[in-house]
From Swiss-Prot:
This is Large ribosomal subunit protein bL33. GO terms for cellular component: cytoplasm; ribonucleoprotein complex; ribosome. It comes from Rubrobacter xylanophilus (strain DSM 9941 / JCM 11954 / NBRC 16129 / PRD-1). Belongs to the bacterial ribosomal protein bL33 family. GO terms for molecular function: structural constituent of ribosome. Keywords: Ribonucleoprotein, Ribosomal protein.
Length: 55
C-alpha cells in the first residue's frame, strides 16, 4: 500500500489576495497534474476567495 501515498500528494492552498497559507489538502497527481485552485473561506480576508496550490 505504499504506492497509494506516492500518487496522492499533500498540497498547501494559499489565498490569492492576502497570500496566507490557510488550508492543506491532498490531490491525485495523475488526475490533476496542474495546480489546484479552490474557492475557500479566508479568515484573514473574512470572505470567500480563490485559494491556489503553492509549491
Amino acid at each position: 500500500m505504499v504506492w497509494r501515498r506516492v500518487v496522492r500528494q499533500l498540497v498547501t492552498l494559499a489565498c490569492e489576495e492576502c497570500k496566507r497559507r490557510n488550508y492543506h489538502t491532498r490531490k491525485n497527481r495523475r488526475n490533476t497534474p496542474d495546480r489546484l485552485q479552490l474557492r475557500k473561506f479566508c479568515p484573514w480576508c473574512r470572505r470567500h476567495t480563490a485559494h491556489r496550490e503553492t509549491r
